[in-house]
Amino acid sequence: MAHETFMYQTRDLKFAIKEWLDMEKLISCDAYKDYYGIDDIDGFLDVSFKICRDVLCPANKDADEPGCKHVGGDTQAVITPDSFKNVYNTVCEAGLGPQFANRSEEGRMPLSWYAPILEMQSGASPAIVMFWCLTAGATTVIQNNASEELKE
């Protein structure tokens, strides 16, 4: 049975990222220096917590019951519950969408910042997050290995 309550403590994550790890060195790299400061992680974690509590976790039941459905025939498709779209749009609008797929894009978040966000999201709704990861993995395979014709 899917859980419907999300409890999480961000204090330890903030400590590990800001005090224990040498994040100043990381965010001084060319890929991040024009986009992030060390205190930006607080906002990302706080927003992620609220989205996990208020949006992802309540959608967790839909992820399990009825869950996704495969539609066969001439058009192969996977149909997701209606709540998936709202969750995905909310997460992306907050700037917390998948960060793994195209690491060459400017403004991407350091993965050491995204990992605890993904951990929170996974705790709030494992099925939804695994669906995203599967999709991101397929996208990465296509980006790195497919012909230009298929990419278009």
Model-derived regions, located:
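Phosphate/diphosphate-binding loops
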Residues: T139-T140, N144-E152
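Hydrophobic alpha-helical transmembrane segments of multi-pass small-molecule transporters/permeases
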Residues: V47, G137-T140
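Amphipathic, small/basic residue-rich leader segments at the start of a protein or domain
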Residues: M1-C133, E149
